[in-house]
Amino acid sequence: MWGLCKNHFPSNKIQVQERNKALKPKKSGSEHKTKQLFPVFNCKKKEKGVMIRFAILRNANTSLLSARSICLFTQAPTYCHVRLNTLNKSITTKRNSLTESKRHVHDGKHFFTTPHQQQQTKLGEIEEGHSPNIKEEDLRSIGQAITHQRNKRRKQIWSAIFGGIFGVIIGYSLIYKVIYLKEQSFLPLFPSSKIRKLSTRDLKKVDINQVQKLSKLRVLEILSGHDMIKEQYGVPLLDKDGNSPTLNEFSMWCEDQDPCVTGIVMEPDDKRDSSHTWYRIPFVCKWRITHRPISIRGTIDDLLNRIGLETADLFEIISPERVYGSFKYEYPLQGDSHALHLWFHGEIELDDDSLIVYNGKYHVDVKLQEIDLFRREKNGQLVQYVLYKNEAGDK
């Protein structure tokens, strides 16, 4: 330290003069005399326009510690210099941060952090010894948790929707119509086929034995006038034993003309006798599963009647079923206003290789639709012969 300070504090007069001559140009007048009496130590800081000037007496006895303190003080910046440097650094930092934020503001991955900070974080984690696989597992678990939460929320929404629909339907059909209005209510469930077996109620209205006899007579009447039957089987038509042919099989079913649905019928629990089989909820209602047709025309009529109109006010439909002799007036079902057709199917065996198959509809009389002859030829091939077909009849 002494070697640093002795150059600034010369020990004799000769050294003082030589140093003053080398460092300072000569000045005229009193300024030159003053500098000979007071040798000057100049420490100039050209940075930011700051200069520090300090003068020490030539003949003063200065200790080593004092010289060291004076040297350090002359090299230290002033308060203004420190404040200017601090302000410049803060302005530069803010300018850089604003530039980076504007540059990366549209990047969704760095919404809360800048890419530079994220890279520093990743480098810090790697330096500390964290494995990148743990990061991937955490991200995967977070993604699975988010997916599970979304699925759960979606199920809750759909459950609320279906629960609301179910509550409205049950409330209107059961509570309002059955319990409050004391009326019958029908709750449709799913579509059903138009064709169905005859119920016990239908069998009470139809004499199956009569339909069977009438259909057999109509078939034998048509076959007796057919040329092929006359030539190959003869008239009157007999079976292999020489007797009148008998029916081997006969069946009947019904077919609705309108689309049908399967649903639940609910009525007030009045404990009256009925031909149907009911399931009862005590003191609430009774219900059963049934099939019902959907009449488009009847639905339109109901809607128009509710607003005070009729179909005749808008248009007039002339239906063949309204004509006398059609099904609706030949075989009306009590309590039912929809068209219902009764079909039958029968088989008559002539011999071991010949079989008569026919089908038709029954209203008041039997109406045959088709008569076929199935015969096995000598070469073993089974052949179908169409003997009669009602082209005008609709199936």
From Swiss-Prot:
Q: Does the UniProt entry include the keyword DNA repair?
A: no
Q: What is its main location?
A: mitochondrion
> What Gene Ontology cellular-component terms does the record carry?
mitochondrial membrane
Q: Which organism is it from?
A: Saccharomyces cerevisiae (strain YJM789) (Baker's yeast)
What gene makes this protein? AIM39
Compartments reported by the entry: Mitochondrion membrane
What does the similarity note say? Belongs to the AIM39 family.
Q: Which residues cross the membrane?
A: 161-181
Question: From what superkingdom does this record's organism come?
Answer: Eukaryota
UniProt membrane topology term: Single-pass membrane protein
Q: Does the UniProt entry include the keyword Protease?
A: no
Record-given protein name: Altered inheritance of mitochondria protein 39, mitochondrial
* Keyword list, A-Z: Membrane, Mitochondrion, Transit peptide, Transmembrane, Transmembrane helix
In the UniProt record, the signal sequence range is: none
